[in-house]
Amino acid sequence: MYGRGSGAEHSRGSGAEHFWDPRPEASSTVSSSLRPPSGARDLLPREVQRREKLEAQLTRVFRRHGYQRIITPTLERLETLLAGGSIRAESVLQLRDGEGTMLGLRPEFTASIVRAAATRLAGGPLPLRLYYHGSVFRNSRREEGSYSSQEFFQSGVELIGAGGWLADAEILLLLADCIRSVGISSCEFSWTLLLGDVSLTESLLSAVAPTAQAAVRRAIAQLDYVYLESAPLPEAARQIGLQILGLRGQPGSVLSDLAQLPVPPERLRDLRQLCQVLEEHGVRVVLDLSLLQTLAYYTGIVFQAVASGEIIALGGRYDRLYALYSPQQVEQPGIGFTLLPDTLLRLLPPDPQTEEMGCKRLVVPLVPAGIPAALALAARWREECTAPLTRTEAVELELLDRAPEEIEAYARQCRIPEIAWVQADGSYHITHPG
């Protein structure tokens, strides 16, 4: 899923960590052939540990709501990824296989998951509740017109086979649960749900002359009041564009304004019920009819979660996408969201537990004859770990035959609290490096 762009610069709201800190000049002295390509980066152990913890927190929430994990290919047929023209071909990193078939690295998850649902999972019980974690890859257009490739990590869910405002509510309350679980709600800043409805916005735009629709829609998506006020547009198109930009604020006020406009009454009723449920569950909602996601497959509600001026999640309803992948052109409603872990980790405060990178113990054979006993001791301590294994419960073995003072310096540098010194007869004593 895309938002208005892929980052905070399109938000409606206002450094990698390392196991050891490298020297500041290191990156500038490394040959370009030894660095990852532009838009990609290495994730070093401490950052991986934070990311894994975040993923585990989200997984618990997803499963608590009845969602099961799905893993789709990183590489797909290009036609699958384009989702019937909803995704621009130039935004996909493309390659050709040995048979000449055009392939691409997925730029988002929804198309691949809906493809799997419409083929491999067709005929099964509905609704399908699926979640995912993984990387997506995009060509992003620079201001001068060239493209740069970028890799992002995403976590999210897709609910397929359930339409209506209640399914919308499930997804949005699940999103709120995810945000609470990772600790955003307990930070100094709060988060806000920006909620729009493509069907209502398109209903209003239908009165705009076809020749002006693209320009008005683009101005709305970019919040470009200046263009709408000054461009040579038909006056009716200008007024409708400005009217849509004004439909933003507290749900009660916006819903009252919408009730005076030519929009489908059943959609207005559903949106009112949805906003009421969200309010009852403590979700801060800003209703925004100018919220137009960049993907053409959205058909109903669209939304962004914003914290501290940055988009942390986005999604929407896509009721016509399933039929594109169904061999029988069967239609099934769908809705989902994706969270942006890179942004979440940047906003969340450092976790003291993940700062403690060191393993629990370092086992050192003092003499070669003590190696069998050291191996046995390390194995026994590992087997005694009853909690889910993390690095802080791990047991390392000394491999480099270093002097005791060098071993202690290593333990201090790696924050290892205990060293077990093993004798030839299997006896050992423990020290605690300062």
Curated annotation (Swiss-Prot):
Family listed: Belongs to the class-II aminoacyl-tRNA synthetase family. HisZ subfamily.
One Gene Ontology term, aspect cellular component: cytoplasm
Gene3D superfamilies: Bira Bifunctional Protein, Domain 2 (3.30.930.10)
InterPro entries, alphabetized: aa-tRNA-synth_II (IPR006195), aa-tRNA-synth_II/BPL/LPL (IPR045864), HisRS-like_core (IPR041715), HisRS/HisZ (IPR004516), HisZ (IPR004517)
HAMAP family in alphabetical order: HisZ
Organism: Synechococcus sp. (strain JA-2-3B'a(2-13))
Pathway per the UniProt entry: Amino-acid biosynthesis; L-histidine biosynthesis; L-histidine from 5-phospho-alpha-D-ribose 1-diphosphate: step 1/9
An example Gene Ontology biological process: histidyl-tRNA aminoacylation
Keyword Transcription applies: no
Miscellaneous field: This function is generally fulfilled by the C-terminal part of HisG, which is missing in some bacteria such as this one.
Localization in the cell: Cytoplasm
Name listed for the protein in its UniProt record: ATP phosphoribosyltransferase regulatory subunit
Transport listed as a keyword: no
Superkingdom, taxonomy of origin: Bacteria
Subunit structure: Heteromultimer composed of HisG and HisZ subunits.
Lineage: Bacteria, Bacillati, Cyanobacteriota, Cyanophyceae, Synechococcales
Region annotation Disordered: where it falls in the sequence: 1-48
Principal location listed in the UniProt entry: cytoplasm
Function summary: Required for the first step of histidine biosynthesis. May allow the feedback regulation of ATP phosphoribosyltransferase activity by histidine.
CDD domains: HisRS-like_core (cd00773)
Any single Pfam family the record assigns to this protein: tRNA-synt_His
